[in-house]
């Protein structure tokens, strides 16, 4: 084994491949059985094994080095990567992270997770991921802009970005600002004649072709995912909790975009956040932490440490007392070293790859339910898909239907009112039909935000049902991750099988 593959620190790409293999071993016979071809059983087996071999590896990995000039006049060489795992559906899709932990292995692993994630939630993209190896705290805004714009040009030169080729998105230490720089650079250089140029990246500000609800999408999806599984009484009896998120306690590791918005939505629907951990310290309050107050404190102070609404927490926040643990930071946080000390009954993977295979086995033995990353944090790519469609359609959701829907709703109310008055109005004059508060809010038709929110909620619910059906069909119990991989493999397999090979 290579140096990085210590028992408790598995190679990240191989870790994802291991999870894939577990899913493939369960579904392989069924795939052979379902093939409607005239081949012999042996040929069918060979075809299935061959396609599974095609799915697994990362198709393209681009490694880049490029110079920038620092504010002090010094020259520096920056390293970056973009991995495209699969082109069974195009474009490829996946975030860009700025972190000192970026490596070829990490980018390949995250790209492969993106392929399976898109398949699980029925978003028609292949998986990709990019990383730039920098610590953003050591660079000025001006320097970060130079790095981002130059990285975009380097990707474009190699054909690794474009609305129909490969569409990046925000990830760790990147957000709307960086996406705006990417879109602007691409649209003003290599794609200055392409009307769809701004669809080259998602997670943009609204003024640059972004979509309402994208910033909170991953956290909102995490909430919907937790809710879908926690409302299922059969699962909750396995882990020993009552159904529903109401009054449950939760702890979050990582108070970035995903952590903050997961906390906000869970709090809004009656769950209680008792602990938050970040790289520089953790806080705990058994009576609950207010998300708004903590968000404001972090904005002002750049840290959660010292927040007056909670006490400092010594030791690992992952091991704190709670019902739901949400790792929303880096990968490989839950390992065989700490898995037995985790008190939560539900682990909701907001981050990508936070659980090692060894920890996964321990959780299954201990009846802890892990809601896997490839389903749970797919809210981000789902709403990115909506944004990409909006860019290709060149019109915001609801723009053409607003007035028509509103008028139709009022006509409906008047029609009911007039019918009632014709029948009963003789005795007492007019019978006003007044919309309820909830209906009044919807009378005007769906805004873009409403459409995004309902589309996301529907996606998370439908995918959860598919995963639950698969888990029950294959008697997987609490092994939700394997059920999700089985679903993803079936869908990707179908595309490869029916497309055939390009040149054989």
From Swiss-Prot:
EC number(s) given by UniProt: 1.4.1.3
Regulation: Subject to allosteric regulation. Activated by ADP. Inhibited by GTP and ATP.
Top-level taxon: Eukaryota
rRNA-binding as UniProt keyword: no
Any one cellular-component term (Gene Ontology): mitochondrial matrix
Keywords: ATP-binding, GTP-binding, Mitochondrion, NAD, Nucleotide-binding, Oxidoreductase
Binding site for GTP: 212, 216, 265, 268
Residues noted as binding ADP in the record, renumbered to the chain: 396, 462
Enzyme class, first EC level, given as a word: oxidoreductase
Record-annotated disulphide pairs: none
GO molecular function (one): ATP binding
Function of the molecule: Mitochondrial glutamate dehydrogenase that converts L-glutamate into alpha-ketoglutarate. Plays a key role in glutamine anaplerosis by producing alpha-ketoglutarate, an important intermediate in the tricarboxylic acid cycle.
Extra facts: ADP can occupy the NADH binding site and activate the enzyme.
Protein name: Glutamate dehydrogenase, mitochondrial
Source species of the chain: Chaenocephalus aceratus
Gene name of this polypeptide: glud1
